[in-house]
Amino acid sequence: MKKYYYVLFIIIFSTLSLNAETTNTKLNKLFIQLKECNSQKQSKILENKIWRLWETHPTNFQLTIDLKEGSRLVQNRNYLKAYNIFSKIIDKDPNWAEAWNRRATTLYLMGKHKNALKDIDIVLKLEKRHFGALIGKGQVYMEMKEYEKAYNSFLESSYINPMNSNTMELIP
């Protein structure tokens, strides 16, 4: 019986590991296409594919559901509940960049700019190509009237996603 559980554990672990690896492979391909893209329409399509991968936890479907619930609460301006949900997700998986990103967004909307920047820094340690976090970082710096830092964040985002309409408007 122990052998059965051991084999089952190996199969499950291998599947979860493969799923995370597949997500990274897909992201790498999409980021290459995004950098080479020369139309805003195609850029938006690629961005949406990247966001779908970021928003989907690679191994835990419940965390994906929780992230969506937290995002719904943000849309309804229930920031404290959303913050708590994102914090619980982070407690369960501190390596999921998108949970940190959503919490950073929530902190920004709550007016807690320094805390938002701390979370954004973690997002960027986990996923250095997170153009959304870089744009968010720029927005936080704009609110703090640190315009040079804001510009640099927007510029860095434009290197990753050159055709993003948000950064194209902000960078001359």
Region annotations inferred by a language model:
Residues 18-68:
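N-terminal leader/linker segments that initiate helical-solenoid repeat arrays
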Residues 31-38, 142-166, 172:
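TPR/TPR-like (Sel1-like) alpha-helical repeat modules
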Residues 40-43, 79, 113, 147:
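TPR-repeat structural position
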Residues 41-44, 58, 131-132, 161-172:
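Boundary/linker segments of alpha-helical solenoid repeat arrays
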Residues 48-51, 87, 121, 155:
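Alpha-solenoid helical repeat scaffolds
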Residues 60-127, 132:
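Alpha-helical adaptor scaffolds
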